[in-house]
Amino acid sequence: MGLKARRAAGAAGGGGGEGGGGGGGAANPAGGDSAVAGDEERKVGLAPGDVEQVTLALGTGADKDGTLLLEGGGREEGQRRTPQGIGLLAKTPLSRPVKRNNAKYRRIQTLIYDALERPRGWALLYHALVFLIVLGCLILAVLTTFKEYETVSGDWLLLLETFAIFIFGAEFALRIWAAGCCCRYKGWRGRLKFARKPLCMLDIFVLIASVPVVAVGNQGNVLATSLRSLRFLQILRMLRMDRRGGTWKLLGSAICAHSKELITAWYIGFLTLILSSFLVYLVEKDVPEMDAQGEEMKEEFETYADALWWGLITLATIGYGDKTPKTWEGRLIAATFSLIGVSFFALPAGILGSGLALKVQEQHRQKHFEKRRKPAAELIQAAWRYYATNPNRLDLVATWRFYESVVSFPFFRKEQLEAAASQKLGLLDRVRLSNPRGSNTKGKLFTPLNVDAIEESPSKEPKPVGLNNKERFRTAFRMKAYAFWQSSEDAGTGDPMTEDRGYGNDFLIEDMIPTLKAAIRAVRILQFRLYKKKFKETLRPYDVKDVIEQYSAGHLDMLSRIKYLQTRIDMIFTPGPPSTPKHKKSQKGSAFTYPSQQSPRNEPYVARAATSETEDQSMMGKFVKVERQVHDMGKKLDFLVDMHMQHMERLQVHVTEYYPTKGASSPAEGEKKEDNRYSDLKTIICNYSESGPPDPPYSFHQVPIDRVGPYGFFAHDPVKLTRGGPSSTKAQANLPSSGSTYAERPTVLPILTLLDSCVSYHSQTELQGPYSDHISPRQRRSITRDSDTPLSLMSVNHEELERSPSGFSISQDRDDYVFGPSGGSSWMREKRYLAEGETDTDTDPFTPSGSMPMSSTGDGISDSIWTPSNKPT
């Protein structure tokens, strides 16, 4: 019962200490752990004095060297307990069972497989011995064919074959077993797959054939004699010497690499053979062979097959001499084709020889390159561990777990360890002498760590631990649970011996983790630089050919980079294809025309659906596009600012000179003064861009202000209105209806104000008072100048002007200036805003898409408002 409770207490304390670097275990060190310890002391039957002696003996060492405290059963329990430890990142305990036997089994299996299938080093000696055995069997089998050596060689051959059968049988069994180290040959299905390999089938066949030969021995019966011929099957054992087929692979690669050359040589040689054989057959088929007595014998070239035999022997430079041409014609043909055919028959031998030489050289170079694999793998591993040991990367845990299992961590100096060990042994001896249950008490105090060892050998004495113990690092981590428990006990008892010896209880493993990690980090940096240096040494060129190849590769890479850079530069600075159609010719006869594709309402940078050509996507094309946009914006801003300044100037003039005064003597005097001060009249220059007679390109007319509607439209013909037209009431009644239209619309010059000076009126009856219903010439002159100012608004409506980027709002409200004693609506109230009828570019070339307002298109204006011209309507 006490043992189970101690396990639970140790597990609770260890879990709290190991979880977050002492956070859980140190939360209540004097409360929970002390209470649990007191309960366990009562359960195991310890007296208070015994506990104090044990604490006095073991308290000072718990937080300094845990390996000495655990050595009581550490050797035995290390083989059986599940290894648990806390990682360098203070994670939860990890359970990683070490399968030493399994690893050893796999290592031996891999070693045997490599020795039999991929021999290197000492394994080549075994294969050389097998080759000598096979060669000896073959030599003895040849000697048995001699009568004088048949008996002796037969006896030795029987012994050697028996030995070879055992050797080859054991080797075959080892091959089948060792093949399990490969993933594709694991299990009985994988072993069957391995046994179906060609060389394994050859071994099985030779073993089966050798067993009956050895069984019958040297008997003289017919069965034994017939079975002895199977001994020559041992020649097939020579094939098994090259288990990996390197020879055949080399020959096959040479033939495949020069297959076209070989086919060409064999093809031309075959054509030469059949042609020469046929011609010699035609010439020599009717020539009989003469013997020594002069008698005729059968012809040497009786058939075409005889001629082919002669051609093959001759062109292959063998020359048996059994068949030769007898006539001079045949000899001439044979000599001619021999000079041609021999060269082509000998050509494949040279091709194969050069191909094999090149392949051998390539294999040597490949072996040289294979030497880079290990340094490259070491460099990659060192680079990863150098990266994984970055203290800022808290998510990389696997590398720290690796060091947890391989790093030996000596906590103290050697002299401190020896002194502490000797002093602890003395104290433990005194405790054991005073209390025979001391050893059991120690074991039960450390039950969470050494349960199995305490149960089997409770009276084992602790032994000092050397600094090379592989379990020291992991064991020290497991001591944290006891360290927290011991710190709580020391806090309650106030052990003076701890203070005298100068060891603090707060010296835990967490204090050493940053130092250990920094040391590991430094080692990783050094190893990374070392492996990098080794890898650079292996990059040295193999021969001059490698140097030339490296220079050639570098030159090609440099050329490709230069070409790429040149392409990018050309793309940036070379103008691409034009993004817009060709400019249209400017229209003749118009006072002012805009460049094509640059209408104020249709900006040049706005993409059009009708444009088929793609825009230039180069950097220079984009620069040009932005420059055009900025230029167009500048022109629009200049236009708007100029128009605004002109408008404000005229407003200031009107405010200054038309403000009503109370001291006006009479209408006649006022008109006289105004005539003296103002002599300029507003003129509107209209030009019809439509086709027609160019006699009057411009027409001048004057418009009185009382004939102007709210939006600047005239009720009657301007010429008639200036010469004593009807009253304003009658003029308002004659305003144009919405249904009236006009045939032609003028094109007004942009930003053009022409003031016609020195204009006088001959009829004094037209002059009226300044406050009468009829407008005086001075008022007409000023009002006409402001109401019908020939400012081209560049086809910009009110909304566009209000959104103008210049910041000037043309349609901004201003103070109403009243010109008249009645205080009613005056012309200034009606003309505060620029009328849409005053916009200019409503001609066909610049008419925007979509419906336009009637005031802009002129659909609601009659033809009588424009000056009559000679143009046909």
From Swiss-Prot:
Residues 1-121, 177-194, 246-257, 355-873 are cytoplasmic. GO terms for cellular component: axon initial segment; cell surface; dendrite; membrane; mitochondrion; neuronal cell body; node of Ranvier; plasma membrane. The modification Phosphothreonine is found at T82. Keywords: Cell membrane, Ion channel, Ion transport, Membrane, Phosphoprotein, Potassium, Potassium channel, Potassium transport, Transmembrane, Transmembrane helix, Transport, Ubl conjugation, Voltage-gated channel. KCNQ2/KCNQ3 are ubiquitinated by NEDD4L. Ubiquitination leads to protein degradation. Degradation induced by NEDD4L is inhibited by USP36. The chain crosses the membrane at residues 122-144, 155-176, 195-214, 227-245, 258-283, 328-354. One of its GO terms (molecular function) is protein kinase binding. A 1,2-diacyl-sn-glycero-3-phospho-(1D-myo-inositol-4,5-bisphosphate) binds at R244, K260, K367. Residues 357-538 are annotated as: Mediates interaction with calmodulin. It catalyses: K(+)(in) = K(+)(out); Rb(+)(in) = Rb(+)(out); Cs(+)(in) = Cs(+)(out); Na(+)(in) = Na(+)(out). Pore-forming subunit of the voltage-gated potassium (Kv) M-channel which is responsible for the M-current, a key controller of neuronal excitability. M-channel is composed of pore-forming subunits KCNQ2 and KCNQ3 assembled as heterotetramers, each subunit containing a voltage sensing domain (VSD) and a pore-forming domain (PD). The native M-current has a slowly activating and deactivating potassium conductance which plays a critical role in determining the subthreshold electrical excitability of neurons as well as the responsiveness to synaptic inputs. Heterotetramer with KCNQ2; forms heterotetrameric M-channel responsible for the native M-current. Interacts with calmodulin; the interaction is calcium-independent, constitutive and participates in the proper assembly of a functional M-channel. Heteromultimer with KCNQ5. May associate with KCNE2. Interacts with IQCJ-SCHIP1. Interacts (via the pore module) with SLC5A3/SMIT1; forms a coregulatory complex that alters ion selectivity, voltage dependence and gating kinetics of the channel. PANTHER family: POTASSIUM VOLTAGE-GATED CHANNEL SUBFAMILY KQT MEMBER 3, POTASSIUM VOLTAGE-GATED CHANNEL SUBFAMILY KQT MEMBER 4. Belongs to the potassium channel family. KQT (TC 1.A.1.15) subfamily. Kv7.3/KCNQ3 sub-subfamily. This is Potassium voltage-gated channel subfamily KQT member 3. It comes from Rattus norvegicus. The gene is Kcnq3.
